[in-house]
Amino acid sequence: MSIEVLLNEFKEIAANPAKQLNDCKAAGKKAIGVLPYFAPEELVYAAGMMPFGIWGSNTKTINRSKEYCATFYCTIAQLALEMLLDGTMDQLDGIITPTICDTLRPMSQ
């Protein structure tokens, strides 16, 4: 498999988080959303579930999350909240929010 094929596959995965989540759920797996950076993914695997990284999306626009986020919040947090608000991540069975920064700390509320 060539590097171009692999890169195109990664681009497709990154551009379609909802499709990846749907594929996971269609396979009968439970999915737990994990926000960056230090969520204990090993615990999710140990519980027989799939950790699903919520890092935002290159295809999303920040709209609804602006109502909840201060202007200094990073794009990763704003896009993650956007995907949670617009239904992209509705199939998640739960979310782990590490509180490593001032932006993610209030996201757990």
Residue ranges and their predicted role:
Residues 1-109:
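An N-terminal assembly and electron-transfer interface module characteristic of large anaerobic redox
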